[in-house]
Amino acid sequence: MIRVKVQVFLSLRNVIGQREVDLEIQNAKVRSVLSELHNRYGDRIQPPLIDSKTKEVNPYYLMLVNGRDLRNLPDRLDGELKEGDVVQLFPPAAGG
């Protein structure tokens, strides 16, 4: 089991109630972080973190692992995490 830090921004802070949360996960994969967040916060996170069709991170979200865009990492959601890694989640934002 490893511990990772998840930092959330914008509207996700309202859902989670804080800027960051420490998670202990058994399977040290990025996908496990999203599963644990879903287990804790469920349908309060909208849109869902995982796209139901592609099984990848919903394209509306930006997800960084240790400051690197998940979309540019070779294993994406199946990438291995290590103790102390930092995952950052940015929800969709609109502006004009």
Predicted segments, located by residue:
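Ubiquitin-like/PB1-type beta-grasp interaction modules and other compact soluble beta-rich domains
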Residues: 1-95
